[in-house]
């Protein structure tokens, strides 16, 4: 929002001795008016405790100025408040949007916080090629084509793509691979592709298959089946038995796909079904994605809540943060009403550009969908609480085995991956009381040009130096949860000696670290543990703590290998076009599709280059000069 907010009363009124929180707040109330806006409560270290919105700032903030009558959570928040900040807005809807944006940015201690907010994958049917590709897509929708989603997970997308390939025989290869084929690939042999790369299907027939696939993704499967059945009958009457058999197989495959999808609500075309279950100061929100009358998967979320927060407040905070960077669907079906229903409708409708309907259904098919989501939320939270309890016992055991002061809340495990020093990547995974914190995982592209190929010590030094130098810069007072309580390093005495040197150089002497080595005969179960200045030790083969350490080490190894493969794959697919100024991914695809290879692009003249869609005369000149200046 530009030019629609202004800061007011950011400085507390002049006071003498330190006042209780409710008196500090009362001093601010006298400076406020009845404008809508957002308020922030800060502690004595200027850390944000809470972000809230208000239709009338003066009235809302005044409710905190009472010395009693608050819930335990609010009472603690008021007690810790040393100052406040305010932003006025033109409308309460703007205040809601600003509030949720600040909560995600500042992560205040007393707010409900959505901790896992990754983007969701979509299916893209591209239209930049005569034979469009169908593929999984995540991120901004810059590429031309039709997008379908969101899907709850990559697995849900992959299953749908497999089904579409079975039914419609569409290609999933890249344009560069498509242009380079001289014979059909294995997918053609197993009847998962129609072989357009080698002319086994005409552009017209392939286009018809693409249109059918798009109709299926839009939910028109009943009409599509009827059309295919009519086509099969017409082909039989015309004695085109091969075509009739192909249509029969497509109808069968389409029927199998529909029966395998499970939940397929007929009365709900486009909606997110969102249900909340709270228990023991914890919460689970279950989201089902219904698109084109089909269930495109579900995802569970575990927002940070307090014991005395009510369901409407939790659900409102979840919706605001969940749709902050996502377009909402036409309908939201909720298990509980939210605190500001009309306000949320206005905010989400503004984001979508058309009316968004929010319902709390009590009967019928929609209520059954919500009940199913609520049941899933309850069961998921039960499993999560059991896992957290078991994880807590393992962390207690880890503290006992390694002589820590208490169970670690954040364990960081480090590993490197490379092939003789090439495409080297460092990896960090994070574990805590709630299991693996995958949103906290980090990969480090090794930049050390002076490193000897395969120098694991040098790679570890670079990774840890970058990690802790950043921590020291961003959080020198250890105020956030980003600082680890324990480091696990893949390696023995040499690695631990190198780590100690790094930590000494950085002045970090309060983070314990342990080296994990596989022992003299490299057998799993005979791991040896190294601590600086102490004897090597081992755990019993059947010790649950040993299995726990092995799982964390294996997870770090898996993540490191995945990062290494991605880096290597990117390097393999690199071409000289990557270095041409003004040529991004889209124009690179267009050039390769038109010419077939980077070498052909390098040989092209200016008129050939300008014939490519999206290549202007100026860019064509840059491309031509780039390759001919190098010649």
UniProtKB/Swiss-Prot annotation:
Keywords: Cytoplasm, DNA damage, DNA excision, DNA repair, Excision nuclease, SOS response. The keyword DNA repair applies. GO terms for biological process: nucleotide-excision repair; SOS response. It comes from the Bacteria. GO terms for cellular component: cytoplasm; excinuclease repair complex. Pfam families: GIY-YIG, HHH_5, UVR, UvrC_RNaseH, UvrC_RNaseH_dom. InterPro entries: GIY-YIG_endonuc, GIY-YIG_endonuc_sf, GIY-YIG_UvrC_Cho, Hlx-hairpin-Hlx_DNA-bd_motif, RuvA_2-like, UVR_dom, UVR_dom_sf, UvrABC_protein_C. SUPFAM superfamilies: C-terminal UvrC-binding domain of UvrB, GIY-YIG endonuclease, RuvA domain 2-like. GO terms for molecular function: DNA binding; excinuclease ABC activity. PROSITE patterns: GIY_YIG (PS50164), UVR (PS50151), UVRC (PS50165). Residues 1-20 are annotated as: Disordered. It is found in: Cytoplasm. Residues 34-112 form the GIY-YIG domain. Residues 222-257 form the UVR domain. Interacts with UvrB in an incision complex. The UvrABC repair system catalyzes the recognition and processing of DNA lesions. UvrC both incises the 5' and 3' sides of the lesion. The N-terminal half is responsible for the 3' incision and the C-terminal half is responsible for the 5' incision. Belongs to the UvrC family. PANTHER family: UVRABC SYSTEM PROTEIN C, UVRC/OXIDOREDUCTASE. This is UvrABC system protein C. It comes from Jannaschia sp. (strain CCS1). The gene is uvrC.
């Amino acid at each position: 929002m530009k030019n629609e907010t202004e800061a007011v009363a950011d400085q507390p009124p002049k006071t003498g001795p330190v006042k209780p929180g409710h008196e500090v707040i009362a001093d601010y109330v006298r400076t406020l008016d009845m404008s809508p806006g957002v308020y922030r409560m800060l502690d004595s270290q200027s850390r944000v405790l809470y972000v809230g919105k208000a239709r009338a700032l003066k009235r809302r903030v005044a409710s905190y100025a009472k010395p009693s009558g608050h819930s335990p959570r609010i009472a603690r928040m008021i007690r810790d408040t040393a100052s406040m900040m305010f932003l006025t807005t033109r409308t309460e809807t703007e205040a809601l949007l600003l509030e949720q944006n600040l909560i995600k940015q500042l992560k205040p201690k007393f707010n409900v916080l959505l901790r896992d907010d990754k983007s969701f994958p979509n299916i893209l049917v591209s239209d930049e090629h005569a034979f469009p590709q169908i593929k999984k897509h995540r991120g901004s929708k810059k590429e031309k084509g039709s997008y379908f989603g969101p899907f709850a997970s990559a697995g849900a997308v992959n299953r749908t793509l497999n089904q579409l390939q079975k039914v419609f025989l569409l290609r999933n290869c890249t344009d560069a691979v498509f242009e380079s084929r001289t014979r059909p690939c294995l997918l053609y042999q197993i009847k998962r592709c129609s072989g357009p790369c080698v002319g086994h299907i005409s552009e017209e027939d392939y286009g018809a298959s693409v249109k059918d696939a798009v109709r299926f993704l839009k939910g028109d499967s009943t009409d599509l089946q009827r059309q295919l059945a009519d086509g099969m009958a017409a082909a039989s009457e015309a004695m085109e038995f091969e075509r009739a058999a192909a249509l029969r197989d497509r109808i069968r495959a389409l029927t199998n796909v529909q029966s395998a999808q499970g939940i397929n609500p007929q009365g709900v075309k486009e909606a997110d079904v969102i249900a909340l279950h709270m228990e023991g100061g914890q919460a689970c929100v279950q989201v089902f994605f219904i698109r084109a009358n089909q269930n495109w998967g579900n995802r569970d979320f575990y927002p940070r809540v307090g014991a005395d927060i009510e369901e409407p407040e939790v659900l409102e905070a979840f919706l605001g943060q969940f749709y902050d960077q996502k377009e909402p669907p036409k309908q939201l079906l909720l298990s509980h009403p939210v605190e500001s229903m009309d306000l949320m409708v206005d905010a989400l409708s503004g984001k979508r550009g058309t009316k968004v309907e929010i319902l709390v259904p009590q009967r019928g098919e929609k209520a059954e969908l919500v009940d199913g989501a609520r049941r899933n939320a309850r069961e998921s939270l039960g499993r999560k609480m059991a896992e957290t309890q078991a994880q807590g016992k393992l962390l207690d055991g880890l503290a006992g085995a390694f002589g820590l002061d208490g169970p670690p809340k954040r364990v960081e495990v480090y590993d490197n991956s490379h092939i003789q020093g090439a495409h080297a990547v460092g990896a960090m995974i994070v574990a805590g009381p709630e299991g693996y914190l995958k949103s906290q995982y980090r990969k480090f592209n090794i930049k050390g040009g002076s490193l000897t190929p395969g120098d694991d010590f040098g790679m570890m030094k670079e990774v840890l130096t970058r990690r802790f130098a950043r921590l020291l810069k961003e959080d020198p007072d250890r105020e956030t949860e980003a600082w680890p309580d324990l480091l696990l390093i893949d390696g023995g005495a040499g690695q631990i000696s190198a780590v100690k040197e790094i930590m000494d150089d950085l002045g970090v002497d309060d983070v314990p670290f342990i080296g994990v080595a596989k022992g003299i005969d490299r057998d799993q179960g005979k791991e040896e543990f190294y601590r600086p200045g102490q004897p090597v030790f081992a755990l019993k083969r059947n010790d649950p703590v040993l299995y726990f350490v092995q799982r964390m080490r294996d997870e770090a190894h898996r993540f490191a290998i995945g990062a290494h493969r991605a880096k290597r794959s990117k390097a393999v697919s690199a071409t000289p076009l990557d270095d041409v100024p003004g040529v991004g991914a889209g124009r690179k695809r267009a050039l390769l599709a038109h010419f077939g290879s980077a070498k052909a692009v390098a040989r092209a003249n200016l008129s050939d280059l300008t014939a490519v869609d999206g290549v202007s005369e100026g860019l064509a000149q840059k491309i031509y000069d780039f390759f001919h200046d190098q010649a």
